[in-house]
Amino acid sequence: MKKDIISGQTGVAASAAVVAFCDVDDSLITTTRVSPCEGAEPCAVDDKGLVCGYLSPKQRVLNQLLAASAQVVLTTARSSKGLKNVQLPVSSGAYAIVSFGGVILTPAGCPEPRWHQRMSEESGQYAALLDELCAHIKDVAAEKNIDVRVRVVVDAGLPLYVSVKHNQKNLFELCTIKAAAESFLQEHHPAAARQQMFTHFNGNFLAFLPPFLRKEYAVRWFMENVAAPGALSIGLGDSESDLAFMSLCDYVLMPSRSQAFAGLRR
């Protein structure tokens, strides 16, 4: 029987020895409504069916390389529903960590029951706070005439975090919303603020995460409970917030034009 070069074990596929935790937007794909370069192919749509993501030729090579050599675990802020709107070479029949780690999807597309039970217990403690924060942001946006979409993201029946996106991609006004929301938390929910309510802000995406919700928590649990023992791990991401889960891995990979890489160079 042929001995696998990467795993070093007879009859063991290379993908069993390597697990790659990969962010999706602006890592495996380019999030844009306009083709980013010649040869790019549409690979993602929004809820209205309009193209919102492309796969560049180099990203296609990266996707194919990962699919051929690793167990790929998509690790994304996208919800379960949002991930279904993305078509990638690595996404078929794979595990996925979605909604900032709030849900781990099995290859069958169902929530991993052990992790889901844990998140169900945690999320129930913060449901009212998320609703209150969402309502406050809507009030601030209306008062200041800021055109944003605000919602509590619910995935697999669990209220997980508050998402804010500007309809004209006005980052200055998003910063205004960010400051108002953080001030509200400090004043009205100081305990939650001290427990590290986390603000994710990258491009036109602003999100407020309760203390239990982090990609790195789900990645660590996956490593301990699902991944093959001793597997080589790779972390791929583009946001500064991705560095936390990437740092759990043996090797780190990021786009050279990304928030994460720019932060490391500062």
Segments (PLM) and residue ranges:
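Active-site neighborhood of HAD-like aspartate-dependent phosphohydrolases
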Residues: D4-A20, V24-V72, S80-K84
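Short, well-ordered beta-strand core segments
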Residues: V72, A96, S233, V252-L253
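Conserved acidic, metal-coordinating active-site core of Asp-based
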Residues: H136-I234, E240-L248
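Asp-based, Mg2+/Mn2+-dependent phosphohydrolase catalytic module
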Residues: L248-R266
